[in-house]
Amino acid sequence: MKTFVRRLAAVLTAALLCFNLYYELAPGYVVGPEWKIAFAAGFAALLGVSLFYGVPKSARGTRRHDYMMLLLWYYLWVLANVLFFDNAFGRGFHPSMDFGAVNLEPLRTIKNYLIAYGYGNISLRLVILNLLGNLVAFAPLGVLLPALFRWQRSIFFFAATLTLGITAVEVAQVYTGAGSCDVDDLILNLAGALIVFVFCRITPIWKHICAVNPRPKKG
């Protein structure tokens, strides 16, 4: 029975992933943030059941690593879609190298959003989508990277990796015309990931993160 449940969950995981891919990529469909979260939660839950349901703890070692790696690849696909292709966020390729879309003044965009909301020029939903969305966009990496890669358990290497990666994304968005290059995006993206990293680091969660890819035993 337990094997049947795991196999059924695996089939449902694949079906959900195909459904998710179709609606994200099919022209004419716009998948909002709420549905993206629902798809991600469903994928993570079903994948977890397919890998762990009824499996003894002693046999879960490699499965933990596989689970986190599959979550990382799914997350990276969702992130790339949101940043470069997603109609829900006005993405698309329009190569132009428009340097007018570059902001290197820290907190300028954040301040402008808050001022515009204060004057009633934009909705609270737009403020949350842009500011809170940027804060949580890279936050999952605060768990996934240190779980999968031992060298990412150093906050210095983790922050350096994220800074380089986010900067590359910002430059690519300007080059492709998919978005702007904004230092405030870097600040919010990095802050969100670091908050999750530090929270895990100072709580018992860190022990479970390290168990995904433990250090080799000496001897």
Where are these regions (language model features)?
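Bulky hydrophobic segments
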Residues: 1-177, 197-219
